[in-house]
Amino acid sequence: MRLFTHGQVLALLAFVNTISAIPSFSTNSYPAHPAEPVSLVSQHQPQAPLGLWTRLRNSVIERVWGVPPQQRHRGGNKHQYPPFSAPASLRTRYGDDVVLRFKLQTADEVKALVEASNILFLDVWSSTDEWIDIRLAKDVVPSLLGLLPKSLQTTHVPLIRDLPQTIYESYPSPFQSSSGHERGFLPSGEPSSDATNIFFENYQPLSVIVPWMRLLASMFPSHAQFISIGSSFEGRDIPALRVGVRPANDQKPRRTLIIEGGSHAREWIGVSTVNYVAYSLITSYGKSKPISTLLEQFDFIFIPTINPDGYVYTWETDRLWRKNRQETSLPFCHGVDLDRTWGFEWNGNVTGDNPCLESYGGDKPFAGVEAHQLAEWVKEQTEQRNAKFVAFVDLHSYSQQILYPYSYSCLSQPPNLENLEELAMGIAKAIRLTNRKTYAVSSACGGLMASQKKKVKSETFLRMESTGGSALDWFYHDFGVKYAYQLKLRDRGSYGFLLPRENIVPTGNEVFNAVMMLGRFLLGKSRAFQELDWDAGFQRPNKDDKPILNDDDDDDNDDDDDDDDDADTNDDGIGRKDDSWVPDEYKGDNDRDESDGGWGFRRLRKR
């Protein structure tokens, strides 16, 4: 008799290792916001015996976390919990830091904000052609505003008002929620079991991810293989999964896609999303004809994080660390930005003399150890394993954008621009019909820079950071991958890099459907492929939603419910307009014209 299913074994491994990997901030600290109480072993419950899985889970929680038995109110069923707040160690590290969003209208505003950020050594979280998010200490706000023009002094809103608390809440909780928002969906649209979903109910540390990947490959050896891309600066393997079914006597070049996340260590949602898509494809092979067809026609390389050293560092030391952990010319400034160190149009001369910058690309092309390892690996696969890389998808956060080449300059256009845009718009539509989340479509330079609009006929692009040396541009231009994209995942800034764990599965649904759309596009117009029931392969959390591939759907008229995380309009949540700590002389009515600030699809290419 089999005691556990495949999913339960994977979940058991993930859960036990996750609990042991949670940072021990304080002996008196507790996880934030438990959605539903967990019945512990030490609590007497005569009404029903606990199953083996439940007892094992609860005993791990009680032993490792030291959670006391839950007490019930007399005559009621409500549970009491000890207070939970960010421990002193987090508050010591992050102090009273906040995250502000500045809305932009002119190139002069961008220039002033860039200069002020460099002077004050501020952490720029994200930037688009409409806004810039900056992390800084509250007591630095007056200094920053004093360096800015009057037009920017009253047009900022706080996104995160208590950074230490928000960071604390991003770590795994030992309380398992039964909320429907945290349940995963298999490609059939049916909710998967709670045991299977334990892995995706929380973000996972590398010490959990690697054994989980190995176990997944061992359970599905016919179409999944655990591999190492190379070694990191600190000697860790760069883990990956190769997923696909290649005919025994097939000598043709094997078309291969790379799905990569975690270049920037603090972007945890990218890591979890790579794992989610890999798991969904692996476990659906043989059950879904479209998915089986994709795995028979392509190899998928899933790399949860190309930056294992940095990712571990975000769990053990600094949740907001971005770069890798290699040494630089300055002993007190570690790390290279692994998305600014690639060889094509590397412009390290912009940051080459300052290793302390977040976007430091190294002192030469491919100075980043892990980027060099991946570049050498794909070359070796092409030369020795007869692989033909046809697509590259680089997952980042945040801002909900689908970006295509080029990143280094808006003055250059890719030769197959029409096809890149067509596919990007199809991916955006698939995402929107999954969870009604709108992703903007743009060239990478347009998504990473701010432009002066309505002032001159030709747009002037200003860089918030170095944009050369990107993986996107190298794979497309130097390595010849015809379809290369960077997806910036949820959200639009309410939480930024600290996206709550409730978003793991919905984001996974969205990117899974994006990958399905990409695969369908790459298969071409062969009748045998087009006649497949592709909608049966897509993940649809709400069965009443429109089919993903309904060609009659009107993108412009479809209801868009994607307004729940607009940080600058949220009066109650983390983006509330609380400006009590902003000097009075910098407060204003914030009544600027925002008529052109919509979130619809934006096609920014220059003709």
Curated annotation (Swiss-Prot):
Protein keywords: Cell wall biogenesis/degradation, Disulfide bond, Glycoprotein, Metal-binding, Secreted, Signal, Vacuole, Zinc
Paired cysteines (S-S): C333-C356
Cofactor note: Binds 1 zinc ion per subunit.
Ranges for domain Peptidase M14: 202-522
Location of this chain's protein in the cell: Vacuole; Secreted
Positions with biased composition (Basic and acidic residues): 573-590
Known role: Inactive carboxypeptidase that may play a role in cell wall organization and biogenesis.
This protein's name: Inactive metallocarboxypeptidase ECM14
Naturally occurring in which organism (per UniProt): Ajellomyces capsulatus (strain NAm1 / WU24)
